[in-house]
Amino acid sequence: MIKSEAVHCTALTKGEKFLHNKISYEIYSEAGTYHKQHGIENQDAVRVGCSNDTNCFYCCMSDGASFCPKAENVAWCTVDNAEKVLRKESISSINENDGKRIAKEIVLKIRSSLYQYAIKNDLEFEKLCSTLIIFYINLETKEYMIIHIGDGLVGNIDEENSVEMLSFPQNGITPRYTYFCNNNNVFKKSLRIYFGKIKKNSSVIVATDGVYEQSNIFNILPKQIKQTKHC
């Protein structure tokens, strides 16, 4: 969650609390029920930090597909490469042109890295599937940019604990089907970019699809997120 003033970010992925340059954030992560039952590692990854312009904060999150070989490694490869692009950015005013340029650079870098990973490990590139959620905010202007491929969600929570969904999960013919960074048509059908401005004293939640399963997280979420439908 990201909160204006002392911006607060809850990237649901690790169970720790931090204070990072005008922004407080919590990270929580836990393997899902199916994963625990079958001895599968947690396949989510997250990176948070500030760009060269320290007024800009980012949260990058990825979920490796369960059927994907080396799913955890693929998720970390996804967020690590996204972070390399975001860290060097310095945007005083977030706009559509910058957003499209950054999103394209990130996706191309992720795909190139996954392709090299596939060659090195004798794997099929088409099976190295991962989602991507990026929330990037200028802490002074409160302007934000969201880059989203696949499921997961981003929501803005105000002082009264009501939610405005900023980015919904994207699913296909069934709720279990989603889109990934390595899809052939990722730029035309899968990549979504949104812009806006966060209100004062509000928070932002960034989460993978696991947010619906983890009851210890789910029970504290505003009901609007609980009722969110896959689209």
What are the roles of these predicted feature ranges?
Residues 2-231:
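PP2C/PPM-type serine/threonine phosphatase catalytic domain
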